[in-house]
Swiss-Prot record:
Entries under InterPro entries matching the protein: Aldolase_TIM, PyrdxlP_synth_PdxJ, Pyridoxine-5'_phos_synth
Binding site for 3-amino-2-oxopropyl phosphate: N10, R21, G195, G216, H217
Species of the source: Rhodospirillum rubrum (strain ATCC 11170 / ATH 1.1.1 / DSM 467 / LMG 4362 / NCIMB 8255 / S1)
Protein's recorded name: Pyridoxine 5'-phosphate synthase
Pathway(s) annotated for this protein in UniProt: Cofactor biosynthesis; pyridoxine 5'-phosphate biosynthesis; pyridoxine 5'-phosphate from D-erythrose 4-phosphate: step 5/5
Catalytic activity: 3-amino-2-oxopropyl phosphate + 1-deoxy-D-xylulose 5-phosphate = pyridoxine 5'-phosphate + phosphate + 2 H2O + H(+)
UniProt-annotated catalytic positions: H46, E73, H194
Site residues by UniProt (Transition state stabilizer): E154
GO MF entries: pyridoxine 5'-phosphate synthase activity
HAMAP family: PdxJ
Family, similarity comment: Belongs to the PNP synthase family.
Length: 249
């Protein structure tokens, strides 16, 4: 396997469970350490404006106490920019955010939001934070991301994962494939994530232009039944099988 495909584990919903009753258990930091042992290459955490799961203290602890790179998902706001500049995570993924949504529902409108996004991308980059933009697999959005100087894009895989197996899912997969190849041609590093499961991850993992997958909700849910280490290790096995062109055990 000459190609390297990184796995970023999103631990937001460990904090969701903790916050359901308050207190400190389960601890996202402990989850991050288990993820590292299970084969994760990085930790992703989304500090939402309403702090519904991950909190400010979590970001500080993850940045200071975990050896793996931290990918901070953040809205394009002055508050979140200040937090990112204070903690200086390895990477920051700018995502759209609406208070009424249960989870991130779609990609950024980079085409329409270029004026707002440009200074945020510049400030993060100058601070040594690697910036990615969470976008739909849309060529116009990719072109706009490149024009803004973002080094990384993350393709939203939600429509692909939500589609029924068969022609509908295949059509969504082809969009991801085309977008990933376009990103690579533009010189962008291409990541993907949102909604990926054991059943949907391998085709995306097999795409040569994809460098990283970020997966969270499914892994935390699966951990209820098999434990977090096993849930993550199995996802890593599916990704490795895709790189080999085989099938995970």
């Amino acid at each position: 396997m000459s190609r390297v495909l990184r796995l970023g584990v999103n631990i937001d919903h460990v904090a969701t469970i903790r916050n359901a009753r308050g207190g400190d258990h389960p601890d996202p930091l402990r989850a991050a350490k288990i993820a590292a042992e299970a084969g994760a290459d990085g930790i992703t955490a989304h500090l939402r404006e309403d702090r519904r799961h991950i909190g400010d203290r979590d970001i500080a602890r993850l940045r200071d106490e975990i050896d793996l790179p931290l990918n901070l998902e953040m809205a394009a706001t002055a508050e979140m920019l200040a937090i990112a500049l204070r903690h200086r995570p390895h990477a920051a993924c700018i995502v759209p955010e609406k208070r009424e949504e249960r989870t991130t529902e779609g990609g950024l409108d980079v085409v329409g939001g270029a004026v707002h996004l440009a200074p945020i991308i510049t400030a993060l980059g100058e601070a040594g934070v690697r910036v990615s933009l969470f976008i739909e697999p849309d060529l116009r959005q990719l072109d706009a991301a490149r024009a803004l100087g973002a080094p990384v894009v993350e393709l939203h895989t939600g429509a692909y994962c939500d589609a029924a197996a068969g022609p509908a899912r295949e059509a969504q997969f082809l969009r991801i494939d085309k977008a990933a190849r376009h990103a690579q041609a533009l010189g962008l590093e291409c990541h993907a994530g949102h909604g990926l499961t054991y059943d949907t991850v391998e085709p995306v993992a097999a795409l040569p232009a994809i460098a990283e997958l970020n997966i969270g909700h499914f892994l935390i849910g699966e951990a209820i039944f098999v434990g977090l280490h096993q849930a993550i290790a199995r996802m890593r096995a599916h990704m490795d099988a895709a790189l080999r062109g085989g099938v995970a055990a």
